[in-house]
């Protein structure tokens, strides 16, 4: 037998769900790295968790490590040997190399070739060794390498961990792993585990992985999170069918309840229907954030949208036959929460949105108050309203009035009691308060949708009107934060500016709005006129980098368009997609290869060209037929009107033949300086025209 089952359980106090979930997906990768480091060939590693334990299981764990060879390369023979001759022995430098390796025999040294040089060489062979001696060091290094964000110390232990560790149980090949002192965490190991808390607190001895799994199963611990999830979903499905309801299974919430339970049971509770007078988002948010309950909706016909039901699903970790007692306890807690919500909501309704003291709340240190932000957004919104009036289906005067009103009240709900309690309801509560105070419905909806999209694949504002409000917020935030140097770097993005920028691009692309990242940003920056000065090209570049997430396309095609002077967002996307269509067409395979080759030569000729240099040329100085042929083909394109971008790209790629012939027959660097300059200027014009569709030399397919 060359392998056996390995099981390691780390018994801990209750792990915080979110920290555990964030790190869980990295655990197999980290274990693989530790095994490889010690020459262990390990196949599939299964990692399980409950709130009280981390468990790793390997079906075929080797009994011995592999034999490995460790190579050491020293200085070149020429400088490591006496008189640069290896037959005359080592000098001080050569001896030093072997002494560092702890070797005493220097007489029979070896050499090898590295980077075409003969160098001193030594190989150490590491023999196979029993893996049982490596398991505990690997486990301890694994625990130390886990990153949960925060950690704690307890007692007099040397190391910290997210929660106190009570035991490490190792089961492998019948070996004894009892009473190993783990000084780092202050305990001695036991080959034992613990049951569900309600089954008892004592250790239960186990002598094999099989026995371990059986003990947990008998004692109400479902070790595999996938099985706990399946149990929850199956029970929810049963409740849906029995009570003719729809349960909203929120993915994040499901992951969380799986992480906080060892033996989950889904139960149906209810609350007083009187609470349904609250906006549904208050109820569902309170249930999810405070109590980890799943919301329930009434079953409706396909034509009707489901409405919130006065029920909820609680996932209990308790082992009890008296389910009603658990349900009643949760109903009592929820009633108190919703009573508070009613109090907050009714208090908010008494306060006119106009009276919100925005001047009392700082937006960001150094960037004024919410009132200052509102005033900046108002100027941006006026500019965008005038720019997009043809998409608003109303007179300009009316549009400006409504947009101005929307901006004026957009931030008022940030000072409400409900949003103070549930910050994720910002905008949503503003919508409800606006409707209650008889604001125009477009205005109210734009307040709700100003923060959209909330994530990469989330819904966008539902109209151009709402989009103007959302864009104004985003543009001001970018200008403001960039102006005080709060620019994302590395993985740090505390103000979520990457997401905000992506949302800006996505809105503009979705509605086909004209927006030039150079001209419009400059105009808006100057129009608002209160931002601290900074290089707008930094912001422009930051926004251009987001296109790689916006368009599903070969990155080199995106780069080819971004390398041109095109800065209109919609036109950039159109050009990228048109180039992709052309290049993906099998009929164009040969044509594109020929053009890539010719265009790279064209680009090389012009790489050091000063864009401001005079570029005039005269056909009277053309001497070769191929010059005239290329000019005629090029001029035909320049003077044509194309029905579509696709046909324009087709025409430009058709220049591959005359370009090839030109480069075969025409010497650009003619001895006659006037002819040479004329040819360079002509090719510069051809090159610049190509940039109307993309910088072809960037494309790598």
Swiss-Prot record:
Q: Tell where it localizes.
A: Cytoplasm
Query: What superkingdom heads the lineage?
Result: Bacteria
Record keywords: Aminoacyl-tRNA synthetase, ATP-binding, Cytoplasm, Ligase, Nucleotide-binding, Protein biosynthesis
Chief location of this protein? cytoplasm
Q: Does the keyword Ligase apply?
A: yes
Stated EC number for the protein is: 6.1.1.14
Q: Cross-referenced InterPro entries, in alphabetical order?
A: Gly-tRNA-synth_bsu, Gly-tRNA-synth_heterodimer
Q: Does the keyword ATP-binding apply?
A: yes
What GO terms in the biological process aspect are recorded for it?
glycyl-tRNA aminoacylation
> What sort of enzyme, by top EC class, is this?
ligase
Q: Which reaction does it catalyse?
A: tRNA(Gly) + glycine + ATP = glycyl-tRNA(Gly) + AMP + diphosphate
Q: A Gene Ontology MF term for this entry?
A: ATP binding
Q: Name one GO cellular component term.
A: cytosol
Family per UniProt? Belongs to the class-II aminoacyl-tRNA synthetase family.
Entry's HAMAP family?
Answer: Gly_tRNA_synth_beta (MF_00255)
Assembly with partners or alone: Tetramer of two alpha and two beta subunits.
What is this protein identified as? Glycine--tRNA ligase beta subunit
Q: Which organism's genome codes for this protein? A: Helicobacter pylori (strain J99 / ATCC 700824) (Campylobacter pylori J99)
């Amino acid at each position: 037998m060359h392998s056996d089952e390995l099981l390691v359980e780390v018994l801990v106090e209750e792990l915080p769900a979110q920290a555990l979930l964030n790190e869980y997906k990295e655990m197999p990768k980290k274990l693989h790295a530790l095994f490889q480091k010690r020459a262990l060939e390990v196949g599939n590693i299964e990692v399980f968790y409950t709130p009280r334990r981390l468990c790793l299981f390997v079906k075929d764990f080797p009994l011995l490590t592999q034999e490995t060879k460790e190579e050491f390369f020293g200085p070149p023979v020429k400088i490591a040997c006496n008189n640069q001759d290896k037959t005359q022995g080592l000098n001080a430098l050569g001896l030093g190399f072997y002494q560092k390796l702890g070797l005493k025999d220097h007489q029979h040294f070896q050499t090898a070739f590295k980077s075409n040089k003969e160098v001193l060489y030594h190989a150490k062979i590491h023999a196979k060794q029993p893996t049982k001696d490596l398991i505990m060091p690997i486990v301890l290094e694994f625990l130390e390498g886990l990153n949960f964000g925060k950690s704690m110390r307890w007692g007099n232990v040397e190391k910290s961990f997210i929660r106190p560790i009570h035991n490490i149980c190792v089961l492998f090949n019948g070996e004894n792993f009892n009473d190993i002192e783990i000084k780092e965490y202050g305990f001695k190991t036991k080959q034992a585990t613990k049951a569900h808390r309600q089954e008892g607190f004592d250790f239960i001895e186990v002598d094999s992985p099989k026995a371990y799994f059986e003990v947990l199963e008998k004692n109400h611990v479902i070790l595999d999170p996938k099985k706990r999830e399946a149990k929850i979903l199956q029970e929810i499905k049963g409740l849906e069918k029995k009570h003719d309801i729809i349960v909203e299974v929120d993915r994040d919430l499901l992951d969380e309840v799986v992480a906080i339970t060892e033996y989950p049971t889904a139960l149906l509770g209810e609350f007083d229907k009187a609470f349904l007078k609250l906006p549904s988002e208050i109820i569902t948010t309170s249930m999810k954030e405070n109590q980890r309950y799943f919301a329930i909706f009434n079953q409706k016909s396909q034509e009707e949208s489901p409405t919130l039901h006065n029920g909820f699903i609680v996932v209990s970790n308790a082992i009890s036959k008296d389910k009603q007692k658990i349900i009643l306890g949760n109903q009592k807690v929820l009633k108190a929460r919703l009573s508070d919500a009613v109090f907050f909501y009714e208090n908010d309704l008494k306060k006119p949105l106009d009276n919100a003291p925005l001047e009392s709340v700082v937006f960001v240190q150094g960037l004024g108050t919410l009132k200052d932000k509102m005033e900046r957004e108002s100027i941006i919104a006026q500019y965008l309203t005038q720019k997009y009036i043809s998409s608003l289906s109303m007179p300009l005067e009316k549009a400006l009035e409504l947009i101005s009103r929307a901006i004026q009240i957009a931030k008022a709900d940030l000072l409400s009691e409900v949003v103070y309690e549930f910050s994720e309801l910002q905008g949503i509560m503003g919508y409800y308060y606006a409707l209650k105070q008889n604001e125009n419905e477009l205005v109210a909806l734009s307040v709700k949708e100003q923060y959209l999209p909330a994530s990469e694949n989330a819904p966008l504002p539902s109209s151009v009107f709402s989009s103007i409000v959302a864009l104004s917020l985003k543009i001001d935030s970018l200008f403001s934060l960039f102006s005080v140097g709060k620019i994302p770097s590395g993985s740090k993005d505390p103000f979520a500016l990457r997401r905000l920028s992506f949302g800006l691009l996505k809105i503009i692309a979705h509605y086909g709005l004209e927006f030039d990242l150079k001209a419009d940003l400059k105009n808006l920056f100057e129009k608002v006129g209160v931002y601290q000065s900074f290089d707008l090209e930094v912001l422009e570049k930051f926004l251009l980098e987001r296109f790689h997430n916006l368009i599903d396309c070969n990155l080199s095609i995106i780069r080819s368009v971004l390398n041109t002077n095109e800065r209109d967002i919609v036109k950039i996307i159109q050009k990228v997609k048109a180039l992709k269509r052309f290049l993906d067409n099998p009929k164009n395979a040969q044509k594109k290869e020929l053009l890539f080759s010719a265009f790279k030569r064209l680009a090389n000729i012009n790489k050091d060209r000063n864009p401001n240099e005079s570029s005039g040329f005269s056909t009277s100085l053309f001497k070769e037929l191929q010059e005239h042929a290329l000019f005629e083909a090029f001029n035909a394109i320049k003077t044509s009107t194309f029905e579509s971008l696709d046909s324009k790209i087709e025409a430009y790629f058709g220049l591959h033949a005359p370009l090839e012939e030109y480069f075969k027959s025409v010497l650009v660097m003619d001895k006659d300086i006037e002819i040479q300059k004329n040819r360079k200027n002509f090719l510069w014009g051809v090159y610049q025209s190509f940039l109307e569709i993309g910088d072809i030399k960037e494309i790598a397919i």
